[in-house]
């Protein structure tokens, strides 16, 4: 089991660090009182490996509870529970700038003076910093820089950034666009199988409709261009730390054209090794209804 205790100066990036650890598959707990660490560690170690990556944030917000940190750490060490301490810090100048940008008060500031709070916190955390397994100074870090450093230290072996999950959603404009879509494409310019009597009652999941939609040159050209766009965007989205990409394909009713195109794009992405899901949101809707959906 890997048991990571995240602590450090307020404003140094503990929230971003715990989010990054969560993306790496860690079970995360924020602001756990140090007095509860022994029981928490014991419970985790009793899961027989079901939980094998733990991260928890301990910081000065715990008030007087924070003074019990070393007592708790000594106890779990005596129980042969292994742990690591990640300490985050930054320069005074950067911390002041971050607090002013967020318009938040430092938890230890006296009379509203941020620098006073930073100085007091540095003093109180010195002993913790001295025994930290890893110290990261985030003064010159972007969120992405910190994420990459966390991945380097706490990822599994050669683990890289978590893979982007792509969800291809087909939908009908008459029921409203998917509110969570990142990229949205309108395929109502394609020939509509709805007006072919023998195809009307089928959907884009059925071969007759799928073949009909994809037989047109404009369909083939569109799929090719859309595939090119996605192959260009996906690496850049991944590099910027995006974890989910919703690609919405819409036609009038969400049963024929959008389903066919979504299925085609899904297959192309899957064949290229992308982590991809598909959701035909409106495929079972009665096309005579006009209710809006999310």
Curated annotation (Swiss-Prot):
Binding-site residues for GTP, renumbered to this chain: 59-62
Keyword GTP-binding attached: yes
Keywords: ATP-binding, GTP-binding, Nucleotide-binding
Domain of life assignment: Bacteria
Signal peptide boundaries: none
Binding site for ATP: 8-15
InterPro entries named in the record: P-loop_NTPase, RapZ-like, RapZ-like_N, RapZ_C
Function: Displays ATPase and GTPase activities.
Family: Belongs to the RapZ-like family.
Pfam families, per database record: PapZ_C, RapZ-like_N
Organism name: Clostridium tetani (strain Massachusetts / E88)
Annotated GO MF terms: ATP binding; GTP binding
UniProt keyword annotation of Nucleotide-binding present: yes
SUPFAM superfamilies (alphabetical): P-loop containing nucleoside triphosphate hydrolases
Name the UniProt record assigns to this protein: Nucleotide-binding protein CTC_02495
